[in-house]
């Protein structure tokens, strides 16, 4: 199977890794010069990966069923396990916010890009 992913942001990179893990040939098309660029600005440059105190009462959108299903399928523990499997060390603040131990969003982008490269995901930029 061949998979084309439009956009090399967090979702695009995660989707590419998931599809590649299932054996698909994957190509990411990103209009920026490199993937993950917007991730560098998240969490004031620290990249808040998740929150250990995440509950549905914190969700204020219109489709609560979708959010609940998504959170159950890929909860905080699974998110942290995923990033740990890529070699990212995280830290949890008293508020429950989870950040890379480096406190740099670039660390998250680097482990994702390295995983894409190691798994043979084709990336076309600009």
Identify the role of each PLM range.
Residues 28, 48-50, 100, 122:
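Short, conserved beta-strand segments within well-ordered enzyme catalytic domains
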Residues 12-14, 35-38:
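Short N-terminal binding/cap micro-motifs at the start of the first secondary-structure element
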Residues 46-92:
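Glycine-rich active-site loop/strand segments that organize a redox cofactor
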Residues 2-3, 16, 65-69, 99:
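Short, contiguous strand/loop micro-motifs
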Residues 1-28:
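N-terminal Rossmann-like FAD-binding beta1-loop-alpha1 element of flavoenzymes
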Residues 42:
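Extended acidic/charged loop-beta regions that coordinate divalent cations
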Residues 73-126:
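Feature captures the FAD/FMN-dependent oxidoreductase FAD-binding
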């Amino acid at each position: 199977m061949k998979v084309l992913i439009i956009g090399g942001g967090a979702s695009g990179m995660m989707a590419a890794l998931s599809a590649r893990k299932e054996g698909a040939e994957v190509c990411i098309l990103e209009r920026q010069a490199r993937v993950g660029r917007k991730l560098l600005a998240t969490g004031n440059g620290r990249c808040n990966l998740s929150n250990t105190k995440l509950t549905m009462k914190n969700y204020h959108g219109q489709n609560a069923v979708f959010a609940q299903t998504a959170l159950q399928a890929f909860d905080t523990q699974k998110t942290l396990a995923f990033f740990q499997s890529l070699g990212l060390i995280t830290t949890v603040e008293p508020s429950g916010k989870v950040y890379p131990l480096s406190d740099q969003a670039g660390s998250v982008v680097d482990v994702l890009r390295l995983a894409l490269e190691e798994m043979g995901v084709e990336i076309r930029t600009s």
